[in-house]
Amino acid sequence: MEKLNALRKQKIRAVILLEAVVALAIFASIATLLLGQIQKNRQEEAKILQKEEVLRVAKMALQTGQNQVSINGVEIQVFSSEKGLEVYHGSEQLLAIKEP
C-alpha cells in the first residue's frame, strides 16, 4: 500500500512537471512569435522612414530649384526641360511631369 501511495505521489509530481514544461514551451513559442513580429515591424518602419527622407529631399530640391541635392546620404537629381520635369533618386524615378 505504501508503494502505491509513493507511486501516486511520484505520478502527481511528474504530471505537474510535464504541465510546467508544456507551459514553458508555449510561452517560449509565443515570445518568439512576438519578437519576430516586432523585428519585422521595425524593418518596415525603417523602410518607411527612408522613403520619407527621400521624398523630403526631393521636395527640397524642387523648392530650391537645384538640379542635384545630397542630404543625409540621400541624393536627388532633377531634370527639367521645356517638355517636363523628372525627379530621380539613384535610378528610381520619383516624379515625372510632362506636357501633353
From Swiss-Prot:
Record flagged with keyword Membrane: yes
InterPro entries in alphabetical order: ComGE, T4P_transformation_protein
Transmembrane segments: 15-35
Localization terms from the record: Cell membrane; Cell surface
Conditions for induction: Part of the putative comGA-comGB-comGC-comGD-comGE-comGF-comGG operon.
Assembly, per entry: The transformation pili are flexible filaments, consisting mainly of the major pilin ComGC and smaller amounts of the minor pilins, including at least ComGD, ComGF and ComGG, and perhaps ComGE. Interacts with ComGD. Interacts with ComGF. Interacts with ComGG.
Protein role: Required for formation of the type IV-like pilus (T4P) that plays a role in transformation. Transformation pili are dynamically extended and retracted, perhaps thereby promoting DNA uptake and transformation. Involved in transformation. Required for DNA binding.
Name of the molecule in the record: Competence protein ComGE
Organism: Streptococcus pneumoniae (strain ATCC BAA-255 / R6)
Classification of source organism: Bacteria, Bacillati, Bacillota, Bacilli, Lactobacillales
